[in-house]
Structure formats: structure tokens, C-alpha cells
């Protein structure tokens, strides 16, 4: 993020990070990842999703950061939401875009 901040006055920048899986680090005696989803503990199935946007990006895309913060606290999302969210951020017109899967669309 520090590198993106260096360029915030020159470019509209955004970073979206999501881990592909969680990891059990000894909780309940379990040390691993890859447990079948239906029996996997929350440490393996709940992963961080972090988004950082430069002020110029937020302004150009008309994003309401308060709305995004509210959604972050009250909405559960999954990896399934990433694809349409990225398409929506860049206004890519395609039949595979699903507005319901776009976690940012309701905050624009």
C-alpha cells in the first residue's frame, strides 16, 4: 500500500487482496489447511479481504466509503464475488458480469 500511496497523486490506484484459503495453526489440535469445506473449521474457511483505494480512484468511481465500511461489517462475501466486483470497478460490459455478486456496486 505504501508504494501505491507514492503514486496516488499521479494515478488512480486500487488494491484488492484476498487469501485463497485459511490455515489451522493448532486450534483444537489441528495443524493444516485443505480440510473438506463441509467439515473445515472457520480458521480455514474465513479469510481476509482487504481493499485500499486512492482518493482519486474513490472520487472517479463515485464510491461511498461509508457504505463500503458498513458492508464490510454486516455482509458476508466469498471468492465468488471477486470477479464481478473487478469487472464492475472498471465498467467492463460483458454478459458474465453479475451485479448481485459485485460487492461495490451498491456503494456507487
PLM segments and residue spans:
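Catalytic domains that recognize anionic headgroups
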Residues: 1-108
Amino acid at each position: 500500500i505504501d508504494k501505491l500511496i507514492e503514486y496516488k497523486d499521479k494515478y488512480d490506484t486500487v488494491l484488492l487482496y484476498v487469501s485463497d484459503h485459511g490455515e489451522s495453526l493448532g486450534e483444537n489440535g489441528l495443524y493444516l489447511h485443505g480440510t473438506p469445506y463441509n467439515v473445515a473449521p472457520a480458521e480455514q474457511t474465513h479469510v481476509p479481504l482487504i481493499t485500499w483505494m486512492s482518493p482519486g480512484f474513490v472520487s472517479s468511481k463515485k464510491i461511498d466509503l461509508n457504505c463500503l465500511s458498513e458492508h464490510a461489517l454486516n455482509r458476508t462475501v466469498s471468492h465468488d464475488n471477486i470477479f464481478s466486483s473487478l469487472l464492475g470497478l472498471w465498467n467492463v460490459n460483458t454478459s458474465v458480469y453479475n451485479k448481485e455478486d459485485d460487492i461495490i456496486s451498491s456503494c456507487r
